[in-house]
Amino acid sequence: MIKGNDFRSKEYELFLERSEEIGLDRTMVQAAGGNTSIKEGDTMWIKSSGKWLIDARSSELMVPVSISQIKDALKDSSCSYDEILKSIDLKISPDGLRPSVEAPMHAILDFKFIFHTHDIFINALAVQKYSQIDFEKIFSDLNWKFIPYVKPGIELSYKLMQLKSFEDNVFILENHGLIVCGESLEEIRHLYQDIRVRLKKFHN
């Protein structure tokens, strides 16, 4: 596994830049909410728990974990977040950083980049009585899934494993925001922009 500061490709730096941009948008991320990840081989770098995406470039807040070890741990349907931490080859930083509780969710989504935001426009619509019907109108031509609310973390990971299809790269989480997946940062940016345009048209 890649350790510490050894992984500093241009792509990784652009990932940090995009994470910071997301963190600056208060309609997408509030305080320490939201998380992003990038995969390189079996290593996934993910935002550490309790840290702010707005600080993605100014401080060390990404933690490397083994994707295969997380997936192996999830085979035990009774596993907990702490048990996953014990089972993975985690490099604990001098500051004691721990990966986001959403790390399992990121690991089971087979895309290079995962961006999870607490988008207020998505959440405002998701709590409405007929929201799923509305989302079907808005995103009819996208590869997306609506995920009924479950507790963030392990429970959400299992729900995604149950409902997702191979091609799904957009997930609407009831009362919990949005997940956008892609193989490039440009794809991530385009999806976010496209989703925003669709939501604005719907509300207007």
Q: Where in the sequence are the language-model features?
A:
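Glycine-rich flexible loops
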Residues: 1-204
